[in-house]
Amino acid sequence: MRHFGHISPTAREGLFFREPCAFTADSPARMLSVALGATLYSPATRPALADDVLKQAGRGVVSMVLCLEDSIDDAEVTDAEANLIRQFAALAARDAASGSQGAASAPAAQDRADTPGEAHGTPGEAGVDVPLLFIRVREPAQITDLVRRLGDSVRMLSGFVLPKFTEERGRHFLEALTEAEAACGRRLFAMPVLESPELLHLETRGEILRGIARSVDKYRDRVLALRLGVTDFCSAYGLRRAPDMTAYDVHIVASVIADVVNVLGRADGTGFTITGPVWEYFRRQERMFKPQLRRSPFLEGRAEELRTALIEHDLDGLLREIELDRANGLLGKTCIHPSHVAPVHALSVVSHEEFTDAEDILSRGRGGGGVLRSAYTNKMNEVKPHRAWAERTLQRAEVFGVAREDVGFVDLLAAGLTN
């Protein structure tokens, strides 16, 4: 699979100076942690879940979480588990019929995706790559039980999302993951969710963070990314951010995000990928504040119509939050609505200017440091201080691609939405 693989090769060529690379569920963890992008959540109770997964894959989704936790009623868990087993079996059967190799998406499947007109087939047809699939569980015992019940269709599974993660609670989840992995003979990743009230409370935050750091470091090779449960953070204080506001406007939430990145997101080799919080809103009738999207990027062609649609669906706030996520050290985003996926991916593409700066900073012969003027003649690049930024930028460029010099996020967003 690849980002923007759902659009035609001709369209990709027109958008990208360097196209997104292909990857599979068996790619290195470092690559997959960056490639997660917009991770779309879906309740595990949906009766046509296999069809839903393939439909979203055909729209550009590359990672999904099938939820057995907060998105379903307590009384639905048993039926939801049974539904998951059926839906994974259906996905595995379709995958076998297409000649692919499950979540690994064999090279042959990627070759099909590069054939004009076959970037993705109709849901259920050959040629549709299954996204990276994760199951969000409630209790550690569900991990081993589900892996056992999945049988051969476990090959469609990339891992588990671990809720309300702390050192004590997380240890049991990670031990269960290790046991399940040994039983099925397949690599399984963990994505812990940091959302407990103890993490939010100032008097316990430091020790909770240090405990989480100890826990995930012990299982570093299996922790793909850390996710933030901002809705739970707000709940602890009876708060809910409005669609005109980002998570960073809620200071108590912004402070815990900063501390999580401080301890767990360092660029010195000890850190992890930390994903952005969920955006809760779709569309509403009335707004209090002025729209946050400037007109200037939307002046050509039908772009003004796109701007209007984004504002009507409350996605201008989402776009701002995505930019603030990256400015604060987060990458990717939890999504609960398909309309949120394209904006996340469009803003994850590396601009030609960013790419040029990063390559200049990391170019051979620059190891001794120094200062150089950007090729765009609009900024100073310091080799040593900007090195970690440049390395992360090139990692993002590998999986999301580099836009052509005259291509902006509006072009990328429009392409993602119309294909």
Residue ranges of predicted features:
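Expand to "…catalyze enediolate/carbanion chemistry for C-C bond making/breaking, isomerization
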Residues: M1-N419
